[in-house]
A protein has these predicted regions:
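Left-handed beta-helix
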Residues: 1, 262-322
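N-terminal nucleotide-binding beta1-loop-alpha1 segment
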Residues: 1-25
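A short, N-terminal amphipathic alpha-helix
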Residues: 37-52
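Acidic donor-binding segment of Leloir-type glycosyltransferases
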Residues: 48-80
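Short phosphate-binding loop-to-helix
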Residues: 71-118, 129-130
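Short aromatic-hydrophobic micro-motifs that form the base-stacking/packing surface
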Residues: 119-123
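The conserved acidic donor/metal-binding loop of glycosyltransferases
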Residues: 124-128
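Conserved core of the sugar-phosphate nucleotidyltransferase
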Residues: 130-274, 284-288
């Protein structure tokens, strides 16, 4: 019985705006308005509809989040218990300290629960297009008998449904390219934090997450080189990932496939396992909404324009009777 009730998990919903968090239009991304409700409440609505979610631990600017939750007619109906925590200095501390609270609560229910066995689902506050079925698909795909950290990914083919078209604006996101295809991480993380050896790397990767500039790329490469667990192979796959991304931008000539072919996804997962000193894997989801975070004012505008249509499109993908 991991993480609380049978086959369900506590969720850490990250809504902080300190450290390297980037506001959009000067506002915490989770507190932006979307169809008359804060963005983070759309995320909470999808979480509460998933049978795999036991409870929600919301961490961020406590007073503003509390005020937002007291507004009428929210998409979140309060069917799952919510614990609201004040934020700390950065993303890592928000997650780690919230996990300590989760552990305290779970052990009060189950004193025999070992800290290293507690599994949590970590989700950001700015993915309002995530549908409950994508949460279900991700959690069901996580083999937590074999792995301790699983990240969700979506294929470029899946994400192409959200690309710009003649009749509407869209969002085109950068993908990483491996032998099996092109993918993007989709913001869903299933993890046993106590079995993640290099937990502090989460903050380092987050700090350099917008790796479109060579400065950010090289800074993270230096961090990888300095890691005790890093090898030349680890640095090589990192550079090859970026080489493939750069070559992917050359139109009509698929040169990116050359470095991508040298990177089987399993090899990448093994390297990440070494770097984090854990058992790491990925799970592909087929909806795509969780990958579309609100990262810029343009993304915010596009999601507002297409919200109903893109939610409806994902609903139409759900098999009848599910």
């Amino acid at each position: 019985m991991e993480g609380g009730s049978s086959k369900s998990y506590p969720v850490i919903l990250a809504a902080g705006d300190r450290g390297r968090a980037r506001p959009v239009l000067g506002v915490n991304k989770g507190l932006l308005d979307l169809q008359g409700a804060p963005v983070f409440t759309h995320v909470m609505a999808s979480l509460e509809q998933s049978p795999w979610v036991d409870s929600i631990y919301l961490v961020g600017p406590q007073e503003r989040l509390m005020e937002a939750l007291e507004r009428p007619n929210l998409p979140f109906k309060g069917t799952k218990p919510v614990t609201l925590l004040a934020q700390w200095e950065n993303l890592y501390l928000n997650i780690w300290n919230t996990f300590q609270k989760v552990m305290e609560d779970q052990r009060s229910k189950n004193p025999a629960l070992l800290p290293e066995d507690l599994t949590v689902l970590i989700v950001p506050c700015d993915i309002p297009l995530m549908v409950p079925e994508e949460v279900d698909e991700f959690v069901q795909g996580c083999d937590m008998e074999r792995f301790d950290y699983v990240v969700g990914i979506s294929s470029e083919q899946t994400l192409s449904r959200y690309y710009p078209q003649k009749h509407r604006r869209g969002i085109r996101l950068m993908c990483f390219h491996v032998r099996e295809g092109s993918f993007r991480q989709n913001n869903l993380h299933m993890v046993r934090p106590m079995r993640l050896g290099n937990r502090d790397y989460i903050q380092k990767i987050y700090d350099h997450r917008l790796q479109r500039e060579w400065g950010s790329i090289l800074r993270l490469l230096w961090e990888i080189f300095m890691a005790e667990e890093a090898t030349l192979s680890t640095a090589t796959w990192y550079l090859m990932l970026h080489m493939a991304a750069i070559l992917h931008g050359i139109p009509k000539v698929p040169l990116y496939r050359l470095p991508a072919y040298c990177l089987p996804k399993a090899r990448l997962e093994r390297s990440v396992s070494r770097l984090f000193r854990t058992r790491f894997s990925t799970v592909e989801t087929s909806f795509g909404g969780a990958a579309l975070d609100i990262d810029t004012p343009e993304h915010y505008g596009v999601i507002k324009e297409n919200f109903e249509a893109w939610i409806r499109m994902q609903r139409e993908m759900i098999p009848s009777g599910r």
